[in-house]
Amino acid sequence: MSLKDYLRQSISKDLEVRHRDSLKIRLGERHPLSVHQHMIAARQIIKSDNAEQQHVISSLSGFLDKQKSFLRVQQKALKQLEKLDVDEIIDTAAEVKAVSNDIKETLITSTELE
């Protein structure tokens, strides 16, 4: 249920309750119109409560769906991290360091030759 429907039901409930209270004051609690309006207001209160619950449920459902997709992405990233081999990372870092040292030495020797 949309927020618009929920608000519509809530406003309708407030109007029916006000009308019920007004009739109760003007005509008395036991007057047939007051009793009838009391039943209408009770029905509208139930509709409004149901609309509120449906809105909360749909909002929570949407939030949980977003969280579920976010957690799936996080889980995939975690699985990829688990697949990485720590020794392989260390070996790669050592190779990069060795290559950078070789480049450094080459630059030093080339500047000395000039």
Curated annotation (Swiss-Prot):
InterPro entries according to UniProt: Herpesvirus_UL96
Domain of life the protein comes from: Viruses
Family to which the UniProt record says this protein belongs: Belongs to the herpesviridae UL96 family.
Name this protein carries in UniProt: Protein U68
Organism: Human herpesvirus 6A (strain Uganda-1102) (HHV-6 variant A)
This protein's encoding gene: U68
